[in-house]
Amino acid sequence: VDKVDYIENRNRWVAKDVPAFKEEPFMTSETDFISKINFELSYTRFPNSGTKQYMGTWADINKSYLEVLGEEIRGNNFLKKQVEELTAGKETPEDKIASIFWYVRSNIQWDGLIRKYPTHTMRKVIEDKKGSTAEINILLASMLEKANVKANPVLISTRDHGFVREATPVSSQFNTVVC
């Protein structure tokens, strides 16, 4: 297609006599307090390609994230033996959780990176003994699953990343995952 027709909307907003922004101690991200208008792309519809949604519902975000990470959590069968050793003699789920948690905490160092998706395999995280927030928490979730303990990763936004606005279901509001 050599030509695409489109509709362009131009808007202009002006704010007058806006007081200066003053940073306060213990404040979360300054972008949460500065007056602004945010725009999010809802969808695109190009000729011969249908409509692509970018903004859906919270359920869509949850489903999409769990589809991506589900394989990572359920996979990693190389962890099975290690988990069996860590949980040997542990009767309750709480004891299994504690054993696995302390193993991960004691053996995997945080590399300083805050991520919501792992960039390395869990095998590499174990070998290197370090990982991002996502890698450490997904490793924990994967090991818990191997011990037959349900693990639910949760997307969150750190204080510097800003508040999550419930009215705007977009995954860019989150910057890390915890388990």
Named regions from a protein language model:
Residues 92-96, 125-136, 170-171:
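Secondary-structure capping and boundary motifs in well-ordered enzyme cores
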Residues 76-82, 117-121, 159-161:
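Short acidic (Asp/Glu) and glycine-rich catalytic loops that position anionic groups and cofactors
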Residues 17, 129-130, 155-158:
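Short, flexible loop/turn elements at secondary-structure junctions
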